[in-house]
Amino acid sequence: VFKPNEVWKPMGDCLPKGVKWVKDAVVALDPVKQQARTAGGQRFDYDFLVLTPGLQINWNKVEGISRETLGEGNAHCIYDFEGAQKTWTALQDFTTKGGRGVFTDTYTKLKCGGAPKKICLLAEHLSRKKGTRENIQFNYFCSGDALYNVPLYTPRLLQIFDERNIGVEVN
């Protein structure tokens, strides 16, 4: 596992030379005129346009959770830099103390449908490495009707979860 300073860079440092980074939301596109309009009212003409629609997580829409309190206690999210760090710290503690680990995914598969499975498997691995596996019950709950939405990989994933005694529940 990498340290935060080994994997994070300011976004501006990641852009190729000659790329103009517009830090605003596109609210209208006119592909015929090759124009984009932003929420801030700017219009851009383009010959070639790359849109990178981001994902905005609205914690205020989840009852009982806010961005500020996420990671306090036992509710964690791996989909942002700060949340991933808090999750790693919590996993270190959990795999030392033991208990019941409940891992979930979402119906929409948020940024990456495989990420929650990786975190569950990482936690299980840590517990084996620490010699605490027998003190932990792992459960993985899926909102959909399968562990993974890529049928080619689902049988092998189910086999791995079974081999590691991780209970899987599908909707």
Predicted segment positions?
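N-terminal Rossmann-like dinucleotide/flavin-binding domain of flavoprotein oxidoreductases
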Residues: V1-Y46, V150-N171
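Hydrophobic/aromatic beta-strand patches that form the interior of the parallel beta-sheet core
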Residues: V22, V50, V102, N139-F141, ...
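Short active-site-adjacent helix-start/loop capping segments
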Residues: L29-P31, D45, N58-N60, K111-C112
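Short, well-ordered coil/turn residues at beta-beta hairpins
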Residues: A39, T52-P53, K61
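Flexible loop residues that form catalytic
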Residues: G41, G54, T106
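Short hydrophobic core segments
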Residues: F44-Q56
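Rossmann-like dinucleotide/flavin-binding elements
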Residues: K61-V62, R67-F141, D145-Y148
